[in-house]
Amino acid sequence: MKSSIHPEYKKFLIKVGSDVFETMSTHPTGEILMDVDFRKHPAWNKDSGNVVNQSNKSVSDFNKRFSGLSFGSKKEAS
């Protein structure tokens, strides 16, 4: 078996605001700073709203500009 072909597996810190999570990874820097809290993602927390639209002005502007388009989906009659 060849030696030293596998990346180093070491402690990895995930920083979200004031919280720090520790795990293991082969990532070269040893830490990552997250600007969006993954715990507030609408897939896991329906009360949080749409995190992407709140934090990214370009996405928000796009959604405002093209909000009336259906992109092929049919709208239900009310």
UniProtKB/Swiss-Prot annotation:
Keywords: Ribonucleoprotein, Ribosomal protein, RNA-binding, rRNA-binding. One of its GO terms (cellular component) is ribosome. Binds the 23S rRNA. GO terms for molecular function: rRNA binding; structural constituent of ribosome. Part of the 50S ribosomal subunit. Belongs to the bacterial ribosomal protein bL31 family. Type A subfamily. The keyword Ribosomal protein applies. The keyword Ribosomal protein applies. This is Large ribosomal subunit protein bL31. GO terms for biological process: translation. It comes from Rickettsia conorii (strain ATCC VR-613 / Malish 7). The gene is rpmE.
